[in-house]
Amino acid sequence: MTPRFPSLRRGLLAPAIGVLLVTAYACASGRHDDRAAAGRNDPTSSAPYQAEVEEGLGAAVAILIDTSGSMSQNAPGDQRSKYVVAQEAVEAMLDATDAFVTRRPDFPIKIGLYSFSSSVHTLRPIQPYDRDAIRSALAKLPRPGGGTGIGDALREARPDLYRAGVFRKYLLVVTDGENTHGSEPEAVAREIWGKSEGAVQVYFVAFDTSPEKFAFLKDVGGDVIGAGTGGELRTALDGIYTGKILAEAVDAGEREPAKK
């Protein structure tokens, strides 16, 4: 009897070809996903940002604090440096957050803390609100030095908002000067506004500097408030954080965004 090896080979070959085709498709699909992700993170791409996790009710706030060299100067009318005054003003925001989470335990608040000068440091990535953890991160704020890289800070913190798992996303910047290092903040703010399709709101507090430098924010759904003293800085931060961010987040959060 003649051995039936050719039939056996054909029987083995068909599944092997199927495996190869599936593997090739998976590799191609993976490359496509990688290219798509790269496009979303490429400043020159028009691809919209995509959430990296499923999103639900809540708000994520990335707080960006200027630690450039000029922040070592005394705050107007104060014997303390602008760096220390800003640190204390941000810490004062925690009282408002405590009150909010007590009143609305059903509405998740996530906060991240970043510093920027000629480089950007993530002191605490965006995580569920924890007063002690944020105070600990504030204590690690780098000493002032270097240039002012506002645009780079916006671009660095933005992706963390899309890992937070909440619909409402905010960038809150405290700075005492104009950009002197890296990407221009106006270009980055416009990029974020366009590619987030308005989902990311950007707010600035111009501390001991003219808010007119950041007037472009009003064109991209954000805002800027000037503050000349430590007291004004606290008032400005409270106005933005409590009066705008928390109020807007809850109002928008009552209505889940339409699925695309």
Q: Can you describe what each PLM-predicted range is?
A:
Residues 50-51, 71-84, 120-125, 138-147, ...:
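Second-shell loop/turn segments in exported
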Residues 2-16:
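Bacterial N-terminal signal peptides that target proteins for export
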Residues 74, 100-140, 150, 160-164, ...:
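Short beta-strand-loop
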Residues 54-124, 153-154, 170-174, 209:
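Von Willebrand factor
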Residues 14-24:
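Bacterial N-terminal signal peptides
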Residues 27-76, 128, 155, 254-255:
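Acidic, polar low-complexity linker/tail segments
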Residues 141-147, 151, 177-239:
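VWA/integrin I-like adhesion module and closely mimicked acidic/polar interface patches used
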Residues 226-260:
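C-terminal "exit" segments of structured domains
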